[in-house]
Design a protein with these regions (language model features):
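Positively charged n-region of N-terminal signal peptides that target proteins for export
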Residues: 1-4
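Bacterial N-terminal signal peptides
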Residues: 9-16
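Bacterial Sec-dependent signal peptides at the C-terminal "C-region" and cleavage site
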Residues: 18-28
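Electrostatic cytochrome c docking/interface patches
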Residues: 26-56
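Sequence/structural segment immediately N-terminal to covalent heme-attachment motifs in c-type
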Residues: 47-70, 76, 104-105
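Solvent-exposed, polar/charged alpha-helical surfaces in well-ordered, non-transmembrane soluble domains
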Residues: 51-59, 84, 97, 101, ...
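Electron-transfer interface patches adjacent to heme c in soluble/periplasmic c-type cytochromes
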Residues: 82-97, 113-123
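C-terminal capping alpha-helices of c-type cytochrome domains
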Residues: 102-108, 114-135
Length: 135
């Protein structure tokens, strides 16, 4: 009986320790539906759009993604998953529709902005702004 309890306890401890070092979900590829991958931004990336996007970014995104979009905002260190760096070639290579989808839907520590930025037009302006943050 003691051996059985000892065995079960060691299994539970092992599972607990493994879960502590397992990779976080944010390392998984973020799958964007094809509909959004192909979606075109209906707003030209002009001064007005970028200015609106920058204002919204400062209000809703800067605390995690940082002033320059490097993923180094004051809240980034508290997150379980890395905050995205918008200046990378990988990020900038994404379609506008993919960025729109990720902003609206969120995942893991990245919240959905469907309610905070309810107007889809405003999300497109944020997309135009973050596309200016390339390295």
């Amino acid at each position: 009986m003691k051996k059985g309890l000892l065995f079960i306890a060691s299994i539970l401890i092992s599972l607990f320790l493994l879960s502590a070092v397992a990779p976080k979900q944010g390392n998984d590829p973020w799958i964007v539906p094809e509909k959004y991958e192909k979606m075109k931004n209906p707003f030209e990336a002009n001064k007005e759009s970028i200015s609106i996007g920058k204002s919204l970014y400062s209000q809703h995104c800067k605390s995690c993604h940082g002033k320059e979009g490097l993923g180094d905002g004051p809240k980034a260190a508290q997150l379980d998953t890395p905050s995205g760096d918008f200046t990378t070639k990988e990020f900038q290579a994404q379609s506008d529709g993919a960025i729109f989808y990720k902003t609206r839907e969120g995942r893991d520590d990245m919240p959905s902005f469907k309610k905070k930025i309810a107007d889809e037009e405003d999300v497109w302006h944020v997309v135009n702004y973050v596309k200016t943050l390339e390295d």
